[in-house]
């Protein structure tokens, strides 16, 4: 009898949690719909919104194999997805972008947290759903024209699939590898740099299998599925411009973040890394720029270390304040952030940009990193599944961080993996909350 009562109470608790896991993303989605109805045009341009629309214009005029320069300078993936929506309605395109991205984000949040709720990590499902659904920067970015929030949703789907796959250790299903590979394929279709993060996650996942054969099969299936994305982008450029590339801006991006006098941000100072064209050519190709920058890093270890520190600070910098560095000036949060009104007065500007503001900004940067690694430490100690979640989450964040160090220091680059960094940070916060509550 006692067992039945205990089980009934447990079921009731699980049902209550499930309702919250549905309610948070749904309420956030409704808030976004209301927000869209009060925004001129139904949404916002992201940091590169105009350039994405230039790509859509080229595709809309000439089709998939448009020769528009923007489609080979930058990866064509995200503009292609927008173009498909434009074929439905060009006049309501921004509304369609906001609605589709918001639905996807809401579903991914639910899918991840619902799977977590069925494991030893059920205790973080509630706060993770709450903080991700209502994080003003990450969640509201679904209303902006940009790949960042959809990529964050893709990573949530991948982690949810991994959790679902490992819940039943006795069952090996190849479909999980296909699905996970497909989501990383979508993420890297929008921004190829996240292909590397996906591959690291697959490796970590595969190594958790006692059977090396099963682990190898899983990794290979996920990898092959993922590689369909860059293959498609390369094929498009081969047909369109007879060039086997995904994009031609990597060298430019790396050059901006390197040099003797610069600090690694977009506002570079001093001369660029010297790079001489290979004869008989008189111009430097993008690939040659990449090689020149890599050589500069290797031959200037002290300067490379200093730049790495600067870029790390920029990567974790606040969205506003005296230490801000990056391309998030169109961050939806800044439209309602209290500091934005505060700096309009001289006394407020002195407070925000003075010693007090700098202290708060440094505490914000250090706090993010400390909570990230503390959350990682907490989750790794629970059981093999939570260890896998911790390893997969941190690996994606660190890869994104390292890519920023290798290119440009920009706080926007942390947004696509912010769903995973929030999971670790919220785990740290919730664990501390439990300890304080228990102590009191």
What are these regions (language model features)?
Residues 72, 76, 80, 88-107, ...:
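Loop-to-helix entry region of an early transmembrane alpha helix in multi-pass inner-membrane enzymes
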Residues 96-120, 153, 157, 161, ...:
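Transmembrane-helix motifs of polytopic, lipid-linked glycan transferases
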Residues 35-61, 218-291, 295:
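Juxtamembrane membrane-water interface segments immediately following transmembrane helices
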Residues 111, 150-168, 179-184, 201-203, ...:
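Specific aromatic-rich, kink-prone transmembrane helix
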Residues 47, 73, 96-104, 130-157, ...:
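Multi-pass, polyprenyl lipid-linked donor-dependent membrane glycosyltransferases
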Residues 48-59, 69-90:
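Short hydrophobic/aromatic helix or loop-helix immediately within or flanking a transmembrane segment
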Residues 129, 176-191, 201-203, 225-228:
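Membrane-interface alpha helices of multi-pass inner-membrane proteins
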Residues 92-96, 311-397:
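Membrane-interface anchor segments at the N-terminal boundary of transmembrane helices
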């Amino acid at each position: 009898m006692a067992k039945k009562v205990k089980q009934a109470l447990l079921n009731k608790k699980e049902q209550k949690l499930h309702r919250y896991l549905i309610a948070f993303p749904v309420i956030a989605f409704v808030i976004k719909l209301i927000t869209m109805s009060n925004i001129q045009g139904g949404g916002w341009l992201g940091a590169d919104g105009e350039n994405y629309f230039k790509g859509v214009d080229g595709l809309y005029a000439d089709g998939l194999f448009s020769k528009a320069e923007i489609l080979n300078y930058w990866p064509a993936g995200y503009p292609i997805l927008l173009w498909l929506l434009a074929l439905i309605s060009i006049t309501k395109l921004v509304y369609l972008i906001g609605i589709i991205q918001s639905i996807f984000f809401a579903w991914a949040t639910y899918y991840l947290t619902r799977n977590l709720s069925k494991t030893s990590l059920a205790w973080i499902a509630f706060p993770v759903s709450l903080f991700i659904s209502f994080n003003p920067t990450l969640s509201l970015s679904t209303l902006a024209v940009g790949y960042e929030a959809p990529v964050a949703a893709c990573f949530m789907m991948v982690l949810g699939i991994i959790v679902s796959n490992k819940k039943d250790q006795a069952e090996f299903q190849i479909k999980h590898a296909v699905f996970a590979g497909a989501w990383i394929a979508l993420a890297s279709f929008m921004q190829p740099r996240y292909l590397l993060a996906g591959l690291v996650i697959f490796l970590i996942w595969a190594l958790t299998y006692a059977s090396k054969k099963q682990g190898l099969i899983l990794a290979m299936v996920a990898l092959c599925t993922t590689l369909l994305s860059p293959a498609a982008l390369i094929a498009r450029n081969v047909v369109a411009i007879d060039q086997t590339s995904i994009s031609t801006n990597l060298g430019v991006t790396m050059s901006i973040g390197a040099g003797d006098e610069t600090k690694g941000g977009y506002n570079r100072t001093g001369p660029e890394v010297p790079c001489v064209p290979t004869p008989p050519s008189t111009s430097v190709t993008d690939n040659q720029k990449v090689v020149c920058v890599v050589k500069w890093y290797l031959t200037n270890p002290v300067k490379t270390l200093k730049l790495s520190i600067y870029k790390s600070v920029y990567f974790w910098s606040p969205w506003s304040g005296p230490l801000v560095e990056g391309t998030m000036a169109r961050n939806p949060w800044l439209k309602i952030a209290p500091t934005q009104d505060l700096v309009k007065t001289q006394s407020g500007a002195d407070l925000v940009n003075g010693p007090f503001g700098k202290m708060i900004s440094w505490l914000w940067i250090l706090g993010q990193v400390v909570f990230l690694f503390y959350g990682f430490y907490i989750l790794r100690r629970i059981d093999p599944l939570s260890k896998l979640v911790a390893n997969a989450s941190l690996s994606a964040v660190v890869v994104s961080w390292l890519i920023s160090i290798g290119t440009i220091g920009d706080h926007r680059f942390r947004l696509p993996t912010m769903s995973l960094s929030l999971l670790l940070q919220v785990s740290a916060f919730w664990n501390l909350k439990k300890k304080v509550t228990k102590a009191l």
